[in-house]
């Protein structure tokens, strides 16, 4: 089983080894000068573990080459993703322009519709006025026809009273 037991520096590791002469370590360790830590991978005997309690991490040893390959593949994936995002940004910008143009067209069409509605309203008013005039004209014609019918009836009555010549 491979375990990683971190120490903050090489001095701490050496002091730990002096304190625990019973403990042994077989494996490797890397000193990282950037964050001043030491990484270990290997086998520690039980006595060493008792004197330096840590939570064991079940990991596999990864070489620098494998790590760099993994990092490169991740960089390539990130580059592809960034390129796709850039392309999508361009497409979104184009779509935004199209939407703006369409909004302008819709505004123009709304103005035209408003104008046409105003014209239709005016025409409806004119039609209502004409209907009123036609209705009043029909009423007048009906009155005139009624008057003419009365006159015809009276004329027929007079004609009936007149005796035809013999």
From Swiss-Prot:
Belongs to the UPF0134 family. This is UPF0134 protein MPN_138.
